Design a protein with these regions (language model features):
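Short acidic/polar hinge/loop motifs at secondary-structure boundaries
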Residues: 88, 208-235
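Short, acidic Ser/Thr/Gly-rich low-complexity loop/linker segments typical of extracellular
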Residues: 75-86
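Extracytoplasmic beta-strand/coil segments of soluble accessory domains associated
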Residues: 88-90, 170-208, 229
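N-terminal periplasmic accessory domains that precede
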Residues: 119-124, 169-173, 189-192, 204, ...
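Periplasmic-side early beta-strands and strand-to-turn transitions of outer-membrane beta-barrels
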Residues: 240, 260-261, 269, 281-361
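Face-selective signature of the C-terminal outer-membrane beta-barrel domain
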Residues: 328-345, 360-484, 490-499, 503, ...
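Outer-membrane beta-barrel signature, preferentially recognizing the C-terminal barrel domain
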Residues: 354-373, 406, 502, 509-569, ...
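Short, acidic, small-residue-rich periplasmic hinge/interaction motif at the N-terminus
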Residues: 38-47, 55-61, 68-73, 102-107, ...
């Protein structure tokens, strides 16, 4: 039998040949006009607009920069340049307008447009090898340039993903996060990094957490790599902003929305063992409205590295499919977005398999969000997010109907307000409610098969630019959990940026609430094991301290060194205890859960050698 406990530790840190003939291809549907403008409709009684035309060029060569993005800062919407770098966009009449111009490999630039200007605008961009103007959001829940963020953030751009053409999201993460690896076991793909497993690494999609399967790991096959805008990676504890489980690392996968009137792609990949991957999407954007439809399907016949045992494969045959729809609308002050995704997965037994059953699962995800600006100083965000998982037992050797053996329902409602009372002060505050309801036919015993937990949260963060070179960020979250009670998680980050140097230091506290399995497990597998939960478990806490130094020279060299320590207290772990008089056919031991301790110290020194001179 098994049981959980908390430990204290410092961690040093797819079979169609026709499809094969198609090969791998990408379709880019051209827009109805060459200008590919995205111009939301602004009400006449709100802001009168006029067409502004211009061109984006390289400051050194004068050559056009195609597909640059143009944003009208005052209106909150924009356009995309055509293949000759030309653009057409609505700007306010008789009012000053500020354009934010971005392009891959160039420094972001803000351009002031004088009232009455309607044509002939030329925007010159300077090349940047380091992409130091990349905008990040995960570390503070507000948009900041990566070089201005007081919390060190690693960014994997869409261009990098397209250049490497990764097969799956697991490949993306494993190749871009040092020390991260996946261990495949019967439960799924388990992440490990610096000694910490799945439950200590928070995976977000557009800021919302992905739910885990009943076995523990996240099914990354749900995620397409084709519509990713960027991936932001934040080391250490971030519970002040994101709550439970943000103890070892936060990975925020930020998806893209359509920018052209019509765009799309289709990709096919085929390999040995009838491994087939299909990935396609189509997007529309017109006068502030956008729609995006994604389709992804994977299938394989599996493979066996032990032919002497044909009844069991190294990897079983499987197939999965994901369909996602996202729609939205925005105008000068308001943005509305809704999305839904449906993911089916089935892992079958080998042709000569002896197991009487296999599993089929369905994951349904729904999201709705509203953003409204009450002026330049105040923005309000409201989000609902629901993730609903169902696992079904399919009988292969017995004539029985399929039966649901497990469900997991996770829902979140959050209200966030961003307020700037002064030009150098920004306050983020909000409230959040989370509900979890799990049903499991076997995990919680025979008498009670449904378990629930919920929590209510209040959080606040203040970002104070004390001096042009000095930025201080402090935050705090209070959580009330239905089982263990209260949790308090503060954070503070400081960045000093004299000249070409940047020095960062920070402290943050993380926490992880005990899971339903750890609390209420009563899973008796006879002579295999008996897992027993512990309803008296305390939450796990971590204290994360980091310091870093960064140097940038002439936009062509960037070097940094970072050291951090993550101390975890009351870590939940399992241990075996002996049973004096086991029942017939059962083991003489049980696995229980309790709290323990761990420590980690890591020094990380990435260096990016680039040409120092043009």
């Amino acid at each position: 039998m098994w049981r959980l406990y908390n430990v204290y530790e410092k961690i040093i840190n797819m079979k169609s040949i026709l499809l094969l003939v198609c090969g791998v291809f990408v379709l880019n549907f051209a827009p109805m006009s060459r200008l590919m403008a995205i111009q939301p409709e602004v009400m006449a009684d709100s802001v009168k607009t006029v067409k502004l035309t211009g061109k984006v060029v390289d400051v050194e060569t004068g050559e056009a920069i195609p597909l640059s993005t143009i944003l009208v800062k005052e209106l909150g919407w924009g356009s995309v340049c055509d293949t000759e770098g030309k653009f057409k966009i609505d700007v306010p009449v008789n009012r000053k307008a500020t354009l934010t111009v971005r392009s891959v490999g160039y420094e972001t630039r803000e351009v002031d447009v004088a009232p009455g200007t309607i044509s002939g605008l030329v925007v010159k961009l300077k090349k940047s090898l380091l992409n130091l103007d990349e905008v990040v959001i995960t570390g503070t829940r507000t948009e900041k340039g990566i070089s201005e963020a007081p919390v060190m953030t690693r960014v994997v751009s869409a261009e990098e993903l397209q250049r490497n053409d990764y097969e799956s999201m697991m490949d993306v993460l494993e190749y871009n996060i040092p020390g991260l690896r996946f261990n495949v076991d019967p439960r799924g793909n388990n992440i490990q990094i610096q000694g910490l497993e799945n439950s200590y690494i928070l995976i977000l999609v557009d800021g919302e957490r992905l739910s885990q399967t009943p076995g523990g790991p996240i099914d990354f096959e749900r995620l397409s790599t084709s519509n990713i805008k960027r991936i932001e990676i934040l080391k250490g504890a971030a519970s002040a902003l994101y709550g439970s489980s943000a103890m070892g690392m936060v990975v925020n996968i930020i998806t893209d929305s359509p920018k052209r009137s019509l765009e799309g792609w289709a990709k096919v990949r085929y390999s040995k063992f009838n491994d087939l991957q299909l990935d396609a999407g189509i997007g529309l954007a017109h006068k502030g409205f956008f729609s995006q439809t994604l389709f992804r399907r994977n299938s394989t016949d599996g493979y066996d590295l032990t032919p002497e045992t044909p009844q069991s494969y190294t990897m079983n045959p499987s197939h999965d499919m994901n369909i996602e729809e996202k729609v939205g609308w925005n105008n000068e002050r308001t943005k509305v977005m809704a999305s839904a995704s449906f993911y089916w997965n089935e892992i079958k037994n080998p042709p000569k398999g002896e197991s009487p059953t296999h599993y089929r699962s369905l994951n349904k995800t729904f999201r709705a969000s509203l953003e409204h600006a009450f002026g330049e100083e105040n923005k309000l965000y409201a989000v609902y997010y629901g993730d609903f998982y169902t696992r079904t037992t399919v009988y292969d050797l017995i004539d029985l109907a399929d039966s649901t053996n497990a469900t997991s329902h996770e829902q979140t409602v959050r209200l966030t307000d961003i307020y700037s009372p002064l030009k150098n002060v920004e306050i983020v505050g909000g409230v959040e409610w989370n509900w979890t309801r799990n049903y499991n036919k076997m995990q919680y015993g025979k008498e009670q098969t449904v378990r629930k937990v919920n929590d209510a949260n209040v959080f606040v963060q203040v970002d104070w630019q004390i001096l042009p070179e000095l930025d201080l960020v402090g935050g705090f979250r209070y959580t009330h959990h239905s089982v263990f009670g209260d949790a308090y998680t503060p954070k503070v980050n400081l960045m000093y940026a004299p000249g070409s140097f940047k020095f960062r230091a920070g402290y943050s506290r993380g926490f992880k609430a005990p899971g339903l399995t750890e609390l209420y497990s009563d899973f008796n597998m006879g002579s295999v094991s008996h897992n027993i939960g512990n309803p008296d478990l305390k939450p796990e806490y971590s204290n994360y301290v980091s310091v870093s130094a960064e140097y940038t020279y002439n936009g062509r060299l960037n070097a940094s060194v970072e050291g951090y320590q993550n101390t975890i207290k009351d870590k939940i772990n399992s241990f075996i205890i002996d049973v004096e008089d086991p029942a017939p056919g059962q083991l003489g031991a049980e696995m229980h859960y309790a709290n323990v301790e761990i420590h980690v110290l890591t020094l990380f020194a990435p260096h990016i050698p680039l040409p120092l001179f043009p």
